[in-house]
Amino acid sequence: MQNKKSHYIWLFLVIFVPALILYFNKVKLGLDLRGGTSVVLQAQGKIEADTMSKVRNIIERRVNSIGVAEPVIQLSGNDKLIVELAGIKDPQKAIELIGTTAKLEFRIKNKDGSYGPVLLEGSALKSAGVSRDQVGMPSVSFELNSQGANTFAKITRENIGKQLAIMLDNKEQSAPTINSEINGGSGIITGRFSMEEANNLANLLKSGALPVEIKIVENRTVGATLGVDSIKQTGIAGLIALGVISVFMIAIYKIPGIVADIALLINGVLVLGLLSGIGAALTLPGIAGFILTLGMAVDSNVITYERIKEELRLGESLHDAVERGYENAFPAIIDGNITTLLVAAVLFFLGTGPIKGFAVTLSLGVVATIITGVFVSKVILKLFIKTFNIKREQLFWKGALNED
């Protein structure tokens, strides 16, 4: 009796906990479902052990500066970074901000237009912000740290009358003439900026320069309307698949078919709850993986019910047939799902972007299938038999146990 109570408690938790997670924390939708931009960046040249981590941190600061909600920024391999920005209004602006190295340099500009060696770098920058120049045009003000301020004072003291070029990624932003020594470590960058350009430059300087040059190797933008259409189409496809499966299971297995359909709904809630719990985003490939695992869940029930039929044909009581049916089906269910789980693991570690989304959903679906196929459906079937006082010959359709 105590064992039965514990089973019911576990069944309640399996249903209630994922549902509670879903209620308070909705599943995040991937880029292909809610619209946005995906950019794959690749580092160029020599890469140190912590280079990509530094790149990720800087890119994250840049993305945060433009106010993107829930950005996805993840490392891929040894030299790539995937950046997903959902719901942004100006994808091109975001791409330019992300892909700029933002290497700030101060050089003396010679009379022939050439530039001298680098005298001061952006690493000495303490802060940057948008301001206005003497004629009211948008500009970028900056402040240097103490060491940078001392170097800046020395540069201006020794080069009075010369032009000091302020370079960003080897492009001159402005080249004011030095009239006197500048102390305090503050200055201003002018360059006929619009307010948006000045704001972007200030954000770049504040986030810091990337330690290596990066190249955009993939750029994909999905419109919000396309995302809505995708959700609608996949939702309809999923409901049709669920309806066909439900009718099929009841038509073939009667009461166990009803149990399988209930377990299928619990499986769906469990997968979505797990997705929400780990903060993973649901993508189109992920939905494909989700629907695939529903099919696998049905397959697990089919294996079990056929084993129960075999036991009933051998003359076992209904209770013993259910127990042995689940016991005999267990190895086949575990073997099939573990194999799928291994494939999903390979896809996750070797794949990128959409493939990873498919692998994550498939993995969670396998876990949910094992739980519902081995435990949940068994408890529900026993509960049905007890509650409705189902007899041995009533479990399946008439004549089902006479089949060879």
Curated annotation (Swiss-Prot):
Q: Give the transmembrane ranges.
A: 7-27, 239-259, 262-282, 283-303, 330-350, 357-377
What keywords is this UniProt entry annotated with? Cell inner membrane, Cell membrane, Membrane, Protein transport, Translocation, Transmembrane, Transmembrane helix, Transport
GO biological process entries: intracellular protein transmembrane transport; protein targeting; protein transport by the Sec complex
Protein's membrane topology: Multi-pass membrane protein
Lineage, top-rank taxon, reads Bacteria
Q: Which InterPro entries match?
A: SecD (IPR005791), SecD/SecF_arch_bac (IPR022813), SecD/SecF_CS (IPR022646), SecD_1st (IPR048631), SecD_SecF_C (IPR048634), SecD_SecF_C_bact (IPR055344), SecDF_P1_head (IPR054384)
GO molecular function term, any single one: protein-transporting ATPase activity
Q: Name one Pfam family in it.
A: Sec_GG
A GO term from the CC aspect: plasma membrane
The primary site where this protein sits is: membrane
Where does it live in the cell?
Cell inner membrane
> Which SUPFAM superfamilies did the record assign?
Multidrug efflux transporter AcrB transmembrane domain (SSF82866)
**Quaternary context:** Forms a complex with SecF. Part of the essential Sec protein translocation apparatus which comprises SecA, SecYEG and auxiliary proteins SecDF. Other proteins may also be involved.
Role: Part of the Sec protein translocase complex. Interacts with the SecYEG preprotein conducting channel. SecDF uses the proton motive force (PMF) to complete protein translocation after the ATP-dependent function of SecA.
| UniProt xrefs under PANTHER family | PROTEIN TRANSLOCASE SUBUNIT SECD, PROTEIN-EXPORT MEMBRANE PROTEIN SEC
Q: Which family does it belong to?
A: Belongs to the SecD/SecF family. SecD subfamily.
Q: What name does UniProt use for this protein?
A: Protein translocase subunit SecD
Species annotation? Leptotrichia buccalis (strain ATCC 14201 / DSM 1135 / JCM 12969 / NCTC 10249 / C-1013-b)
